[in-house]
């Protein structure tokens, strides 16, 4: 349960639609080794729940096949991160985090369109990087967007870039789980998947202690050579709302 919105959605489905529900508990203190066994057992419980509801048996071969595709997609994503750390970033604005956020939740290594898109986009990206082409007419500032973004206003970064020369080279919700999933051993695969879910959207930086969002911001600024931070005032996330004073 990463946030109030998730809790409310699950409660609504459970109460009003009378749907079978499994409450998948993801550890908050995800950097601690002591919680990892619990995290894996939660995943095993989720698998058992699905098997009971569907009458099907979990197909490890299909899972490993999908995770191989997912791992390749993750490698393409990491290429984007690396290029944006250079003097010639190629992926700025909302394109960076919106695609990352939704492909992470939608693909699961099952939809071939995502991997094909990654290949094509990264080919264009690497061509621009190798030719040292600027991604915008003017780059006055290298900026990091922090806190939870506003999905209902996705063109904010484009406006900042076009009007002010503020190039967003990294966004908090694009820098989510980069864990490569084991594709041979079921136990190791579940351990990797559990660690990945602990670092997903609205979790990696907003859970597990202030260091994951406050201290991590300065790490990201250094990695991306940023000279500006744009901070979303996300009042619907209690984690970020509670840390606002710490940032100030």
Predicted regions: what is each one?
Residues 1-58, 174-175, 179-248:
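Trp/Phe/Arg-rich N-terminal binding region typifying the photolyase-homology
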